[in-house]
């Protein structure tokens, strides 16, 4: 395994979606992540199975392994079941500093109102509520996300940039460079093909869930994207890949492979 200090001081976290088989077992996901050598982890909140016991188990694994929780996901605005309060409480209990939110609400104002409410719930825990834009949701691009965030009067609101969704939405790196960097408390990094298999919502979802590539293995200029952010900004490595799931059925081997290849990509870009 490559040494961390050879390549970058950036904190790297394994996104929970890289091992979707463990969505209902977040404590084991933390163990797998730490065992593979990651210094930080994502946490998936499953509404059906999460309990106070889950919070204790996840927190214990985080503390025992000396890793940090970069984020917890996901709050879906527009669904009839409101997971916001429960997820924020869980994030506070395990020490996650950011919460990922997506929206299917019909207007900027509706989304902003819900974000404002979530920010008020999360503020005491020093947690940032991060709106992610995706072409197949109501908030489709960085410009959409900026319009929403303008309507939120809260210091703990942010925007989550995922390189795949940046590319698919037509958002440019120049647009990112003109923004207040404080809007981006962490970033999701990966790579991808120059074009998705198609532009329908279902095809874009498949692109996001199954077809991602390791940074530097695709056509999305992952190195340039990485260079846009100071090294104190954590990167969540969001390589959701059906081929990797098939090649590495062992979870720790998969996590270790993604880490090694990501560190190699950072070494190339330095």
Where are these regions (language model features)?
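Acidic/glycine-enriched edge-of-secondary-structure segments
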Residues: 10-16, 68-75
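Histidine-acidic metal/acid-base catalytic patches
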Residues: 1-18, 23-37, 63, 85, ...
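Glycine-rich, proline-tolerant flexible connector loops at the mouths of alpha/beta enzymes
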Residues: 40-63
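Active-site acidic/histidine proton-transfer and metal-coordination neighborhood
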Residues: 25-31, 65-68, 74-159, 168
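Charged, low-complexity surface patches
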Residues: 22, 51, 80, 111, ...
């Amino acid at each position: 395994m490559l040494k961390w200090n050879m390549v970058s001081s950036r904190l790297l976290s394994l996104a929970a979606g890289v091992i979707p088989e463990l969505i209902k077992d977040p404590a084991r996901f933390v163990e797998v992540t730490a065992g593979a050598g990651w210094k930080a982890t994502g946490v998936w909140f499953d509404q059906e199975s999460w309990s106070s016991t889950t919070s204790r188990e996840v927190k214990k694994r985080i503390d025992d392994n000396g890793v940090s929780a970069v984020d917890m996901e996901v709050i879906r605005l527009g669904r009839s079941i409101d997971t916001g309060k429960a997820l924020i409480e869980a994030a506070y209990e395990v020490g996650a500093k950011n919460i990922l939110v997506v929206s299917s609400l019909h207007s900027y104002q509706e989304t902003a109102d819900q974000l404002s409410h979530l920010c008020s719930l999360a503020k005491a825990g020093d947690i940032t509520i991060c709106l992610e834009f995706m072409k197949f949701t109501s908030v489709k691009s960085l410009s959409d996300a900026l319009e929403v965030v303008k309507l939120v009067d809260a210091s703990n609101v942010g925007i989550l940039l995922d390189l795949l969704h940046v590319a698919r939405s037509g958002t440019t790196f120049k647009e990112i460079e003109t923004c207040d960097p404080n809007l981006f408390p962490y970033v999701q990094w990966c790579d991808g093909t120059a074009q998705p298999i198609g532009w329908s919502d279902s095809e874009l979802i498949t692109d996001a869930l199954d077809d991602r590539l390791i940074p530097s293995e695709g056509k999305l200029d992952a190195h340039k994207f990485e260079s846009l952010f100071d090294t104190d900004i954590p990167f969540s490595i969001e390589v959701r890949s059906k081929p990797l799931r098939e090649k590495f059925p062992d979870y720790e081997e998969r996590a270790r492979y993604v880490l090694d290849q990501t560190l190699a990509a950072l070494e190339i870009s330095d």
